[in-house]
Amino acid sequence: MKSASVASLFLAALTMFAISPASAEIIGEDAAACAGGHGPAIQVNIVGLKDRTGEIWLELYPATESDFLRPDQDLVAEGKVFRRTRSRPPASGAVSICIRKPHAGRFTLMLRHNRVGKDKFSVFSDGAGVPSNKPLGRSKPKFDQAVIGVGPTVTVANIRVQYLRGLRGFAPLDS
C-alpha cells in the first residue's frame, strides 16, 4: 500500500514537471541568458497563442508612464532602457521567450504576436499581452498593466496573449 502511494506521488510529480513551463522551449536572441537561471533576464511563459505563425516580440521599456510604448529610437537616443527580442514560435509545445535586462528593478514589458510580419502593430491580426494579464479592451495597454519588478537573476512571468474579439476589443481567446 505504501509503495503504491509513493508511486502515485512520483507519477504525479513527473506529470507536473512534464507540463510545467520549465519544460517549454525558450526562444529569442537572449535565450542563453535564461538558461540555468543565471540572468540577468526575464523569462516570459506565453499562454494562449492563436497559432504558430509569424514572430513573438518581447519589448522591455523603462518603468515610467511617459516612456512606456514610446518609439524605440527615441528611447535609445536618450540613453534610456529599451530592448526587443524576437523569434519564430516553435511548431508545438509550450513557449517561453527570454529577454536580457540591464539590472534589477522595475520595468515595463509588452509582448506581441506579430502574425503578419509587419513592423507596425496590426490591430486585426496581431496579439498583445502584458504581465498583469488584465483584458486590454479597446485601448493601448496601460502603464500599470505592464509594470514588472525584477530581481538580479532570472525573473519568470506568465503572459496570456490577447487578440481582437469584436466590439469588446482585445481579450484572451478563451474568455
Regions found by a protein language model. Name each.
Residues 59-61, 74-76, 110-111:
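Short acidic/polar alpha-helix capping motifs at helix-coil junctions
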Residues 71-101:
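Tryptophan-paired
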Residues 20-69, 120-175:
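Primarily secretory-pathway and cell-envelope proteins
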Residues 112-116:
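Acidic, divalent-cation-chelating loop motifs in proteins
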Residues 1-5:
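Positively charged n-region of N-terminal signal peptides that target proteins for export
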Residues 95, 102-111:
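A short tyrosine-centered beta-strand micro-motif
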